[in-house]
Amino acid sequence: MISILQRVKQARVEIDGQVAGSIGPGLLALVCAERGDTEAEADKLLAKMLKLRIFADDAGKMNRSVQDLDGQGACGGLLIVSQFTLAADTGGGNRPSFTRAAPPAEGERLYDYIVQRARALHPEVATGRFGADMQVHLLNDGPVTIPLSIAPATAA
């Protein structure tokens, strides 16, 4: 599975002009399932998202995770948005290929799984809608943008 994490002051996703999900300070996670991904890769990716220390501590060092923004246990928001284009292969010309992305039904199943697990593990989770034409608005913090990739076990 692939994710691009962006540390944000705020973010929201709109579908057909309506806000589908929004957060204050926290992480915007663009997520893509690849062929061969399973719940195991989704679990590893989510664990990394929640534990990655990319928020500043009192000394200004990246020492806090989205689960502990202020050092006192206050959690930030997690906005999860599906984006199959993260699996783009741009090596064969000027038109990207998306054959590395999971088939739509499998991608949706794994997206729903990671959202369900995130809601079980984190108090503030918002989402877009799989397959929808979405507009994502964010106020990037830093900016801090981190790519994450968990290879399918079959590819190891």
UniProtKB/Swiss-Prot annotation:
Belongs to the DTD family. It holds the Pfam family Tyr_Deacylase. An aminoacyl-tRNA editing enzyme that deacylates mischarged D-aminoacyl-tRNAs. Also deacylates mischarged glycyl-tRNA(Ala), protecting cells against glycine mischarging by AlaRS. Acts via tRNA-based rather than protein-based catalysis; rejects L-amino acids rather than detecting D-amino acids in the active site. By recycling D-aminoacyl-tRNA to D-amino acids and free tRNA molecules, this enzyme counteracts the toxicity associated with the formation of D-aminoacyl-tRNA entities in vivo and helps enforce protein L-homochirality. Its main location: cytoplasm. It is found in: Cytoplasm. PANTHER family: D-AMINOACYL-TRNA DEACYLASE 1, D-TYROSYL-TRNA TYR DEACYLASE. This is D-aminoacyl-tRNA deacylase. GO terms for molecular function: D-tyrosyl-tRNA(Tyr) deacylase activity; Gly-tRNA(Ala) deacylase activity; Ser(Gly)-tRNA(Ala) hydrolase activity; tRNA binding. Keywords: Cytoplasm, Hydrolase, RNA-binding, tRNA-binding. It catalyses: glycyl-tRNA(Ala) + H2O = tRNA(Ala) + glycine + H(+); a D-aminoacyl-tRNA + H2O = a tRNA + a D-alpha-amino acid + H(+). The keyword DNA repair does not apply. Homodimer. The lineage of its organism: Bacteria, Pseudomonadati, Pseudomonadota, Betaproteobacteria, Burkholderiales. NCBIfam families: D-aminoacyl-tRNA deacylase. A Gly-cisPro motif from one monomer fits into the active site of the other monomer to allow specific chiral rejection of L-amino acids. The keyword Metal-binding does not apply. A motif (Gly-cisPro motif, important for rejection of L-amino acids) lies at residues 142-143. One of its GO terms (biological process) is D-amino acid catabolic process. It comes from Delftia acidovorans (strain DSM 14801 / SPH-1). InterPro entries: Daa-tRNA_deacyls_DTD, DTD-like_sf. It is an enzyme of class 3 (hydrolase). GO terms for cellular component: cytoplasm. Its EC number is 3.1.1.96.
